[in-house]
Amino acid sequence: MSKQQKLIDEGEIAADYLEQFLDIIDFDGDIDLDVEGDRASVSIDGGDSLDMLVGRDGQVLEAIQTLTRLAVQEVSGERSRLMLDIARWRANRR
């Protein structure tokens, strides 16, 4: 399996996990997958209600990213370097 395909698979595992997470906390969001350089990138967009999932200085976002990486690692057996963005918070800080 190519490195590109592994990253795509990693993104799909993350998207499945995040979909379940959003369902549990009763939030709506559109999940987009991408590969940027040597890491999978997942973003959740869907309005101002998602700001709560970013938190102060991105602290909640970082926590969700860590949980998502652990979920990916549990399924894939490999350490994840996945990057998560919510409500374009990271994109707007670049």
Segments the model singles out, each with a brief description of its role:
Residues 1-94:
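RNA-contacting regions in translation and RNA-metabolism proteins
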